[in-house]
Amino acid sequence: MAAYSYRPGPGAGPGPAAGAALPDQSFLWNVFQRVDKDRSGVISDNELQQALSNGTWTPFNPVTVRSIISMFDRENKAGVNFSEFTGVWKYITDWQNVFRTYDRDNSGMIDKHELKQALSGFGYRLSDQFHDILIRKFDRQGRGQIAFDDFIQGCIVLQRLTDIFRRYDTDQDGWIQVSYEQYLSMVFSIV
């Protein structure tokens, strides 16, 4: 058996709070049509990736794009229709606002100190060593900082892991006891 700890804070869980209102539907429809290159009525992960900017002149993380599409694709069509796209638009816009809030030096990147503030703001109480692990895991450019798209991905993964942990933390004391196979099941449901 293995034990793992998480100290839940109030409302712990990364993610943007309810953000700004959506732009008008005609604006979003025009954006949708520009992104839907093949005119299928569905934006694929490749189309969305090409349309997104992470602010570093590198392609948006394809894993992040697939994660976002899977959250909003209610019909398992490997893409989002216009109705679902409005949710994607709001989700990404809300994340941009969160990112800008914690990017205190306006570098377009989140460093370890800014990440710690962001996660603390989400209710997480994690060690400096764990913040180092997150930076190493989600820093695709090897600069000790996380770009916007990788910040989203890191928060998505952290939330999924936290959700799984909470299912096993029945007494909500921040400790769980799981068998090796349960542990593997938890990990493989994320990767």
Curated annotation (Swiss-Prot):
Coiled coil (UniProt feature): none
Origin superkingdom: Eukaryota
Short name of one Pfam family: EF-hand_7
Keywords carried by this UniProt record: Acetylation, Angiogenesis, Apoptosis, Calcium, Cytoplasm, Cytoplasmic vesicle, Endoplasmic reticulum, Endosome, Magnesium, Membrane, Metal-binding, Nucleus, Repeat
Membrane topology of the entry: Peripheral membrane protein
Amino acids binding Mg(2+): 169, 171, 173, 175
Domain notes: Interacts with different set of proteins thanks to 3 different hydrophobic pockets. Hydrophobic pockets 1 and 2, which mediate interaction with PDCD6IP, are largely formed by residues from EF-hand 3 (EF3) to 5 (EF5), as well as by Tyr-180 (EF5) of a dimerizing molecule (Pocket 1) and from EF-hand (EF2) to 4 (EF4) (Pocket 2). Hydrophobic pocket 3, which mediates interaction with SEC31A, is mainly formed by residues from EF-hand 1 (EF1) to 3 (EF3).
GO cellular component: COPII vesicle coat; Cul3-RING ubiquitin ligase complex; cytoplasm; cytoplasmic vesicle; cytosol; endoplasmic reticulum; endoplasmic reticulum exit site; endoplasmic reticulum membrane
Keyword 4Fe-4S (UniProt): no
Record bears the keyword tRNA processing: no
Protein name per UniProt: Programmed cell death protein 6
GO molecular function terms attached to this record: calcium ion binding; calcium-dependent protein binding; identical protein binding; magnesium ion binding; protein dimerization activity; protein heterodimerization activity; protein homodimerization activity; protein-macromolecule adaptor activity
Positions where N-acetylalanine occurs in the chain: 2
Family matches, as InterPro entries: EF-hand-dom_pair (IPR011992), EF_Hand_1_Ca_BS (IPR018247), EF_hand_dom (IPR002048), Peflin/Sorcin_CaBP (IPR051426)
Positions of the EF-hand domain: 23-58, 59-89, 90-125, 126-161, 162-191
Function: Calcium sensor that plays a key role in processes such as endoplasmic reticulum (ER)-Golgi vesicular transport, endosomal biogenesis or membrane repair. Acts as an adapter that bridges unrelated proteins or stabilizes weak protein-protein complexes in response to calcium: calcium-binding triggers exposure of apolar surface, promoting interaction with different sets of proteins thanks to 3 different hydrophobic pockets, leading to translocation to membranes. Involved in ER-Golgi transport.
Subunit structure: Homodimer and heterodimer; heterodimerizes (via the EF-hand 5) with PEF1. Isoform 1 and isoform 2 self-associate; probably forming homodimers. Interacts with CPNE4 (via VWFA domain). Interacts with PDCD6IP; the interaction is calcium-dependent. Interacts with RBM22. Interacts with PLSCR4. Interacts with ANXA7 and TSG101. Interacts with DAPK1. Interacts with SEC31A; the interaction is calcium-dependent and promotes monoubiquitination of SEC31A. Interacts with ANXA11 (via N-terminus); the interaction is calcium-dependent.
Localization per record: Endoplasmic reticulum membrane; Cytoplasmic vesicle, COPII-coated vesicle membrane; Cytoplasm; Nucleus
Residues that bind Ca(2+) 2: 103, 105, 107, 109, 114
GO biological process: angiogenesis; apoptotic process; cellular response to heat; COPII vesicle coating; endoplasmic reticulum to Golgi vesicle-mediated transport; intracellular protein transport; negative regulation of phosphatidylinositol 3-kinase/protein kinase B signal transduction; negative regulation of TOR signaling
Protein residues bound to Ca(2+) 1: 36, 38, 40, 42, 47
